[in-house]
């Protein structure tokens, strides 16, 4: 006999950056584990220091960090933590990115532009990530940017079941805010047995976050319309889409999105909108300035925790959604 056999069992360790500790703590609670104590702070010049207070040698490590504002700081912190885990001899490192930063920069729209979503994936791989686990990427092709497995989770079951339980389904119409979201909206229609409508929009390519809404395709008159999107950033697109639906006779509009980015003028736009309710998951923390009266936040932690367990136990993440 050659070599050495060990009797040690696999060990799961969960680490968190400082961007969204509430979500990390809830994921840990769902898994029945504690977060690994971590010392992290900023030096006077803005550099980030990280040190884990427990050994990660030989462990299957899961590092959770959502890319919220200030996004560049938290992306960098995650990369530094990845490097620390790699140098600590972790057996495997899975990066949990509930909201994947730079996802909208997934292709070149014009010459001399970067593909920043690919750059983020390359940086994670170089820093030490073996696997990425994320929720509702802006576009599916981002999964191919990372040189390794990518587990793509979906918030649709959580959001759709919430809406379906509170709205008379006979009056429900699912609305895609643009042509790019039609496939997702179609899955909503299948789940809730509801018709589909589409808001056709056109962006001004020279002005960031500027949207002009043109027309509504489908019957929305007298209907409770549910606008479905992956993220709400400044709120311009979705509020303009809601206005178009009301102008075409919608009885009510509910907005759902996985990621509530809510930057800049979003707080005022949501507050002043005729939309009755905005429904998000907690992939990102809700900014303090946002009025919560019209906002419902659903927990994505159980979904992430189940996926982590499947990865750790060499199970199937896909099966979590095939059953639904």
PLM regions and their residue ranges:
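PRPP-associated nucleotide enzymes
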Residues: 1-324
